[in-house]
Every structure is written in structure tokens, then in C-alpha cells.
Amino acid sequence: MSQSNSDDSASSSTQQAGDGQDDVQQNIVWHAHTVSREDRESKLGQRGVVVWFTGLSGCGKSTIANELDRLLIDRGATCTLLDGDNVRHGLCAPPSVLKEEHGEDFAGRFGLGFGPTDREENIRRIGAVTELFASAGVIVLAAFVSPYQRDRDRVRNTIESSGRAGDFLEVFVDTPLEICKQRDPKGLYQKAIAGEIKNFTGISDPYDAPPSPEIHLKWREGQTPHDQASEIIREMEKRGVLGPAKG
């Protein structure tokens, strides 16, 4: 996930909701749908699940997720891919991106940097989006550093509370930090080590390795993204969250 030093000082959490919305929760009720989740899954012929990739920057999350996306599409599945860098251009954009169009006040309230609270909100937003997709029967691939275990656990609870146990598959892309530093495709580690980027996971910010992920992809010399994506396919089939290929 790309990180920008200029965004670290801005945190939406420091702003108050305001605008007379403090009691809005009292006036919001859940509107039941006529079409159920089961109806949608039956129509698609699949189970809506979230495959959540986590790991250090440069570990291979996005590359493996893209390969898995292709394998799933090729076998007739309906899926979508949410990537950490891409959502920072819209849904979870930093203040610097929002400021020009929406103004400084809006950007300060809703733009997200990379401090602990902003990271928490980033994953909360993504978790809510993945829940919407999964409840529609879509297989969701989410590739995010998501460094804090508590935030990943909250997403898991959101997904499984609205669906079933087992609807959230945590994939730990376990690539050693030294290998990630060597890859450094965006030059971020070099900048972080030089002090040009703050709150960088693995350098100046911690990463909570998953203690018991559903899928643990340990780095092995010579293993390709296709090999790793195929391993995930096999595990999904084994767990009964992915049916046979269609067509």
C-alpha cells in the first residue's frame, strides 16, 4: 500500500461529526430486502465470501490476488478485487486528493492518512464494502497491508455476522522483510529508511502477523504467483467455499 508523508498529519478521527447529526442513529432502521442473500447466491451458483490478503508492502499481495482473480474468472466465478493502492484514489483518499474538489474542511474530516486511527478507518470502510459484495453472492478479493490484527478481526466479525462462519478467509502472504526490501517496487522502503515516509509498516510502524490464518502462504524460492493463487483455489475447494468450475 502506498504511503504519503504529507498525509500523516491529517486524521479524520480528530473531527467531530457535527451538522446536527449526533442523534441520527435513533432515526435509522434496517430495511429488509425482498431478495435474500440465498436467492442471489443461488442465481450466481456460488457462495459469497471474502478472501482477505494481508502482509507487508512488497510481499506479493496484489500480484497473487490479481492472479487469483483471473483463475476465478476463467472458471466462471463472479468476483471482484479491491486493492489497497486503488481505494486510496477514491473511497479512502488522503486529504491531499480530496482538498481541491471538496475543500480543506471536508478533506480534513474524511480524508485518510496513515496514522493508527486513519488506518483503522481505512480497514473499517473496506470491511463494510466487502460485506456488501459478499452479501450479494460475490467472491471478494481484498489486498491490503492491514497491519493490525484487531482491525482484521473486526472485518471478520462483520462478514461472518452478516453471513456464515467461514465466509472470511484470511490469507497471510508471509514474505520476509528483507525480501520485501529487496523488491521494493515503489521505492517505499528506501524512502521509509531515509525518514521520508512516516508510519511505514515494518520500518517505523508494527505489523501484527496473523496467528492462525486460514491460508498461510510462506515465501519459497522459485514459487510463482500462479502457484500461490492455485494453492488458494485448492484451499477454497477444500473448505467448501468454492464449487466446481462452470461451463
From Swiss-Prot:
SUPFAM superfamilies per UniProt: P-loop containing nucleoside triphosphate hydrolases
Pathway(s) where this gene product acts: Sulfur metabolism; hydrogen sulfide biosynthesis; sulfite from sulfate: step 2/3
InterPro entries (alphabetical): APS_kinase, P-loop_NTPase, Sulf_AdTrans/APS_kinase
Residues the entry annotates as binding ATP: 55-62
Catalyses which reaction(s): adenosine 5'-phosphosulfate + ATP = 3'-phosphoadenylyl sulfate + ADP + H(+)
Name of a matching Pfam family: APS_kinase
Signal peptide (UniProt feature, chain positions): none
Enzyme Commission number(s) from the entry: 2.7.1.25
Example of a GO biological process term: hydrogen sulfide biosynthetic process
Region (Disordered): 1-24
GO molecular function: adenylylsulfate kinase activity; ATP binding; sulfate adenylyltransferase (ATP) activity
UniProt superkingdom: Bacteria
Record bears the keyword Cell membrane: no
CDD domains: APSK (cd02027)
Enzyme class label: transferase
Swiss-Prot/TrEMBL keywords: ATP-binding, Kinase, Nucleotide-binding, Phosphoprotein, Transferase
Job description of the protein: Catalyzes the synthesis of activated sulfate.
UniProt xrefs under PANTHER family: BIFUNCTIONAL SAT_APS KINASE-RELATED, SULFATE ADENYLYLTRANSFERASE
Listed NCBIfam families: apsK, PRK03846.1
Protein name: Adenylyl-sulfate kinase
Native organism: Rhodopirellula baltica (strain DSM 10527 / NCIMB 13988 / SH1)
Phylogenetic lineage: Bacteria, Pseudomonadati, Planctomycetota, Planctomycetia, Pirellulales
Gene that encodes the chain: cysC
